[in-house]
Amino acid sequence: MNDIKPAIMMVLVFTIICGGIYPAVVTGIAQAVFPKEATGSFITDRSGREIGSALIGQPFSDSKYFWPRPSATTDFGYNPAASGGSNSGPTNPDYLKTVANRVKALKDTGVSTGIPTDLVQASASGLDPHISPEAASVQIPRVAKARGMMEDKVRRLVSGHTEDRQFGIIGSPRVNVLALNLALDRLAP
């Protein structure tokens, strides 16, 4: 019993430190320094109701909205509990069929120019909330027509919602689909 007592004490001490104190300190610092990000970067509508997160993609299929990247999550699209890519390789027949179907669906909506890959391939997480400015641009005619808006007005809105690379060097320019669609709803519901 004397041999096991120090081991049990160490388990209890490290459980308290690693399972209680450390998470509480990190959460407290995050809440103080990055309050919005620490609570999930939620986006609210005009009434203040939380309708989504700037960090997790949401499905949009109506022609009056910009469409996000396809989701690769299981059970249902954009399932945050099942985040992950499809893990299908570029020569996998099922993957190729899925991409071909997505390309066809986009062409059926009138996209005749080059289709950006982020509109037909899921991200590694399967939950990416952003698309490239190019992916937004090819959707402008459809969205403008569905809302009865001038394409130039929609193009300016996309340009205004295009975020630069992080710190000027990391990643690519991107457009948050949820934020863009909310701005569209404010202009022309």
UniProtKB/Swiss-Prot annotation:
It comes from Geobacter metallireducens (strain ATCC 53774 / DSM 7210 / GS-15). Keywords: ATP-binding, Cell inner membrane, Cell membrane, Ion transport, Membrane, Nucleotide-binding, Potassium, Potassium transport, Transmembrane, Transmembrane helix, Transport. The gene is kdpC. The system is composed of three essential subunits: KdpA, KdpB and KdpC. InterPro entries: KdpC. The chain crosses the membrane at residues 6-26. Belongs to the KdpC family. Pfam families: KdpC. GO terms for cellular component: plasma membrane. It is found in: Cell inner membrane. Part of the high-affinity ATP-driven potassium transport (or Kdp) system, which catalyzes the hydrolysis of ATP coupled with the electrogenic transport of potassium into the cytoplasm. This subunit acts as a catalytic chaperone that increases the ATP-binding affinity of the ATP-hydrolyzing subunit KdpB by the formation of a transient KdpB/KdpC/ATP ternary complex. GO terms for molecular function: ATP binding; P-type potassium transmembrane transporter activity. It is a single-pass membrane protein. This is Potassium-transporting ATPase KdpC subunit. Signal peptide: none annotated.
